[in-house]
Amino acid sequence: MEKVQQTIRAPRGTELQTKGWVQEAALRMLMNNLDPEVAEKPEELVVYGGIGRAARNWESYQAIVDSLKTLESDETLLVQSGKPVAIFKSHEDAPRVLLANSNLVPKWANWDHFRELEKKGLMMYGQMTAGSWIYIGTQGILQGTYETFGEAARQHFDGSLKGTLTLTAGLGGMGGAQPLAVTMNGGVVIAIDVDKRSIDRRIEKRYCDMYTESLEEALTVANEYKEKREPISIGLLGNAAEILPELVKRNITPDLVTDQTSAHDPLNGYIPVGYTLEEAAKLREEDPERYVQLSKESMTKHVEAMLAMQEKGAITFDYGNNIRQVAFDEGLKNAFDFPGFVPAFIRPLFCEGKGPFRWVALSGDPEDIYKTDEVILREFADNEHLCNWIRMARQQVEFQGLPSRICWLGYGERAKFGRIINEMVANGELSAPIVIGRDHLDCGSVASPNRETEAMKDGSDAVADWPILNALINSVNGASWVSVHHGGGVGMGYSLHAGMVIVADGTEAAAKRIERVLTSDPGMGVVRHVDAGYDLAVETAKEKGVNIPMMK
């Protein structure tokens, strides 16, 4: 992959570079994904998650930019794995962009075949929000992480993480949310990363409090704050596959244990034991097969240590990076003895159509986001947990790139909020249109048997019709851009998922599209969980009037 040293930053204000606000939104969000404040390796078009890219290569990036600048408001741009391949006449209520990233026929859906295609320039890895142009930096996963640790606290620690120690690893674009999510819940956390730059970035953005290269110092500080029942986050430089076994050897057992290293990609994401970053890069280039094998062996040691901590009483869970599957394939037959975070903590929210709803101020003015914060505090005042989140986010979350906010809203709530935002754009309360989107990790848009759809009640973990239906209904209902991806979060062969974005530009046409899309999108989450037999989803569907023909 050619590296290009250029600083990309989304335009701000109300002057259009394109022929309409929806096209402008797509252009600005593509560029925002590659803003140095947002992207992990913008010079390689990598946004987050190992090699999750916004475009296939620099030539394709420029062609997408040029296409969006000339795209008419009754045309649709098609993007195949980060490359613009067609512009067709459609209609004004159709999506302006349709994206399909990293999709492979199941028999060939593995990293080896993907890498062959990538080497030939035929495919890119889109992760979830990298290739769908709606990544907003670490805040994008922060509330979900906050909710996960909050639910763990409710289930196991009387509602708070005060006086507890969490041990985790991985401080990249996704995992970087963990330190702040734990301290927001009152806890102490040691977060390990092998890359000093990742820790420095989290400290710079106020997601992590301190840095150390010493395990002794990390443990001393952690124990001091744990005894005081005060929160602190400690970024520890090191390899988790070395540090966790060492803690087991010393008989040190944290209260919670999880992991968000880039284990989904053994070649580009995980660093084997005993290698510096430079040595790992050299081996990756010279002998990728050996590199992958060493990575898998290290992951197995990593999971063995997590299991040992679980046996000693630690609340242990997989945070969706497929590390258990790798260890299992390497012969660790009890790798799945600790659960994934969705069945352990998040699924009840999915049953209510809740998920990581986000919005971005195209103006670039933080005041536009602060005004929308006030809408949440006013319109959803009865949801104290949500309002607490908004207040904490305002105080503690630093914007990356265009100002944005995330919060988990459910069926009915998303459409209500979207209507209000569109009205605020229409009457000038907000200085420019707002982009509304979400992660692919949502209630009705993903099939991922080792993550979002793990341990479904009816055994339908691997049924991938649901994300396809989600993308289809969002497209016909007028989402601004819609994406269908493969392999996000957990790697090739293990997930299919869909994304959508809708632009609130203040027009009456946008109001109608918003109503349709922000109803059907979370509605798919309710439907999917009703179909799987979840009572809470059935209650939600009946209460909200979701029309499900065979619901009993």
UniProtKB/Swiss-Prot annotation:
It comes from the Bacteria. This is Urocanate hydratase. Its EC number is 4.2.1.49. The lineage of its organism: Bacteria, Bacillati, Bacillota, Bacilli, Bacillales. Its cofactor is NAD(+). The keyword Lyase applies. Its main location: cytoplasm. It comes from Bacillus cereus (strain ATCC 14579 / DSM 31 / CCUG 7414 / JCM 2152 / NBRC 15305 / NCIMB 9373 / NCTC 2599 / NRRL B-3711). Pathway: Amino-acid degradation; L-histidine degradation into L-glutamate; N-formimidoyl-L-glutamate from L-histidine: step 2/3. It catalyses: 4-imidazolone-5-propanoate = trans-urocanate + H2O. HAMAP family: HutU. GO terms for biological process: L-histidine catabolic process; L-histidine catabolic process to glutamate and formamide; L-histidine catabolic process to glutamate and formate. Gene3D superfamilies: Urocanase like domains, Urocanase superfamily. Keywords: Cytoplasm, Histidine metabolism, Lyase, NAD. It is found in: Cytoplasm. Disulfide bonds: none annotated. The active site is at C407. Binds 1 NAD(+) per subunit. Catalyzes the conversion of urocanate to 4-imidazolone-5-propionate. NAD(+) binds at residues 49-50, 127, 173-175, 193, 239-240, 260-264, 270-271, 319, 489. The keyword Lyase applies.
